[in-house]
Amino acid sequence: MSSFDQTMQFHFSEEPAETNIREVLLTVYDALQEKGYNPINQIVGYLLSGDPAYIPRHKDARTLIRKVERDELIEELVKFYLQGQRKD
């Protein structure tokens, strides 16, 4: 039987997406801080505008943040914030 006749399986990484997003945000935050920028203002500017010029190339931060969709970044930030506010 030819290998083209067999069903292939694709396996996703077992690492949750949130971990990657958190790592990206923390790396970007550190890079901004090291360059002397206000990290919160710069990240908000990027999230609102989509302009990668708000993020420096230092520590490959610009490349990292562009690998994640802005809506996914916002979703992760909102989830983290709301989970921290709950007193259940």
UniProtKB/Swiss-Prot annotation:
InterPro entries the UniProt entry points to: IreB
UniProt-listed Pfam families: IreB (PF06135)
PANTHER family per the UniProt record, alphabetical: UPF0297 PROTEIN YRZL (PTHR40067:SF1)
Family membership noted in the UniProt record: Belongs to the UPF0297 family.
Protein name: UPF0297 protein GWCH70_2489
Organism: Geobacillus sp. (strain WCH70)
